[in-house]
Amino acid sequence: MKFDTIIIGGGLAGLLAGIRLQRAGQDCALISTGQSAMHFWSGAFDLLNRLPDGTEVDYPLEGMQKLPMTHPYSVIGAEKVLAYLRSAVETFGSFGCRTHIPEELCNIFRLSTMGSLKRCFLTMDDLLTTSSPEEPLCRRALVANLDGFLDFNTEFIAKGLEDSGSPCRTVTIRLEALKKLRRSPTEMRSTNISRILDRPTFKEYVSQIREKYDGEDLIVLPSIFSLADSGDAIQLGKVMNTRVRFVATMPPSVPGIEIQRG
C-alpha cells in the first residue's frame, strides 16, 4: 500500500495531524506501538503546567514566552498553538465530543481518578473541573458507582471532594444487565460496561440514581458512557435541577477510544 504521509504516534498530535491531512486529500497511515495514548485519555489535555525550572504556570500561552527558544512551543509560537487548539475543539466536536478552552486562557483543575486535583487546559465539557483548587467544587455531592466496578474508587473521589470543602455521599448502583460481568473483575471494565449500557439498561441506571438522589447540587459519575449516552446523563441533571459531571476511570478510556474510532 502507498501513502502520502506516514505518522508515527497515535496520541492527540498524531490523530489530529492525520485527520487534517486526510481532509486535505492525502492518504495517511497512523502507526503506534500497542494501544494509542487515546486509550488512556482522562478527558483533558495539559498544555503547559510548569516551566523547566519547576515554576507553576497559570497562563500557559503567556508562560510559553519564558521557554527556551528551541522548545517546540517557542518554535511554533503561542498564536499558532492557540489556533491549533481551537481546531482540535472543532475536530472533537465533529465526533460528538464537546470540549472547550477556558475563556481566560488559564489552566484549570480536574478531579483525577485518584481524587487529586490536576492542572489541565483543554477539557471535555462534562468533566468535573474547577477554576481554583481552593474553591469548593459544590455544596454537596453524590458519587454513584456501579456494583463491582473497581476502576472507579469512590473513596478516593469522595476524599478529593471533601478535601476541597465539598461534603460527599457515595452510593452503589446494581444493574441486572451487568450480572455476568460482575462474575470476573477482569471483565468488569469500562469498555465492556459501555457496550451493555444500551437504552433500556441506561434508563434503569438513571432511575436508580433518581431514587438515591437527596438534593445534592452535584452528581459525580464514572466516565463509562458512550458520547451519546453521556449527553443523556447531562440531561438527567437538567431534569433534576442539578449538575451531573464525570470523573475519568482507570484505563481504558471510553471517550478516548470512541474519538479514535471516529
Protein language model annotation of sequence segments:
Residues 3-30:
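N-terminal Rossmann-like FAD-binding beta1-loop-alpha1 element of flavoenzymes
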Residues 18, 82-85, 260:
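Short, hydrophobic/amphipathic alpha-helical packing segments
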Residues 1-3, 173:
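Generic detection of short hydrophobic beta-strand segments and adjacent strand-loop junctions
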Residues 10, 33, 146:
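Cofactor-binding loop segments of dinucleotide-utilizing enzymes, especially the Rossmann-like FAD-
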Residues 8, 30-32, 99-101, 170-171, ...:
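General beta-strand structural signal in soluble alpha/beta enzymes
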Residues 47-149, 156-167:
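Dinucleotide-binding Rossmann-like beta1-alpha1 core, especially the glycine-rich loop
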Residues 33-69, 177-192:
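Conserved N-terminal glycine-rich FAD pyrophosphate-binding loop of Rossmann-like flavoproteins
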Residues 24, 36, 40, 119-261:
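Predominantly flavin-linked oxidoreductase catalytic cores and closely associated redox partners
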